[in-house]
Structures are given as C-alpha cells and as structure tokens.
Amino acid sequence: MSQTGSAGLFQPVTGRIRGVLRGRIAAGFYIHRMNRLPKRLLGRRELVDFPAFALGGVEAKVDTGAYTSAIHCTNIHLETNAPARPVLVVDLLDPGHEGADGRPLTFPDFVLRDIRSSNGEVQERYVIRAVVQLYGEHFEAEFSLSDRSDMKYPVLLGRSLLRQGRFVVDVARRNLSYKAQARAAARRARP
C-alpha cells in the first residue's frame, strides 16, 4: 500500500526541518505534519507573564471552548477628556495579587463587543489587545475585560491565542511554558 496524501504523516525521516531535528524533537513540542512548524504543548493551567503591565507568574486557565481570552478587571469605566477620545480605565487583577500595585491602567484603544459566556449568556464587554508571554515568546492577543473574582483563575486563554501560537493542550499537564522558560534560564546561567 503506498503512502500518499495524509497517510504518511508520521513517517520516520532524517534531516532538518525548519530548525527542528526530525525524529528528535525537544520536550514540549509536537510535529503533527512534516511540512509545518512544530506545535507547542500547553497544560490545562499555565503561568503567564504580561510584560506591558509588569506582571509575571499570573495563573491562567487554558480554555479551548472560549474563542477570546479574558483577564480579571474591576472598576471598569470610561473617562472622557474634552477634545480627546474616551479612555478605558481599569483596575487590573485584585490588590492581593503579587505584582498588582493597585494603580489603574488606561487603554486608549479598545472596542465594545458582545461576548458569549460559558453559560450561553451574551454580555457586552470591553476588549483590548495585550501582549502575553509563553515559552519566552510574546504573543499579542485580544482580551475581554470582566470581573472574574468568582473564578479560580484570573486569566483565561482562548482559542484565538492558541491558534496564533500553534499550541496544543495536554489536559493532564500544567505550567509547561513556565517550566520551559525556567530550564532555559538555568541553561543560560551555567558557565
């Protein structure tokens, strides 16, 4: 039987493909087709960094059922200065969170969008673009702003971010990105 089309996806091969050794793939990476870049694994729960907000190690839930990512905010309101456009002002995370200094953040660029919650209810939420760090790389994604104080995790990572970063979720694991960054930092620190 010949191997044509998608039947030969996992053939053993040798050589280099886009910087990744075929047959010998670094931990946390998965090649699902030979002609594409490897996909990276994320656990069901991850620790993420927001460099623009000077926040690191924020607990996030990876949710393949949500399209848009979300971040916990309180005191969400608009401030209008006479000649300028309105500015969105929020308190990001709770004051008890490490790194949250209690100062309000302002966002001049935002949109108001209908977001369907997990229970099927449609809510109008403000959406911003923010940079999140996973596996030492920065990804810009849309985050809806909502009060997630009744949720266990202040950040939710949705499908649009997962697709952009070519991530696959392994629900049996956690903090894969954070552990990979720690290993890379330890390797750099060695003489």
Regions found by a protein language model. Name each.
Residues I31-P191:
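Pepsin/retropepsin-fold aspartyl endopeptidases
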Residues R22-R33:
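Short, Lys/Arg-enriched N-terminal segments with co-localized hydrophobic residues
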Residues P12:
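Cationic, low-complexity basic patches in intrinsically disordered or flexible, solvent-exposed regions
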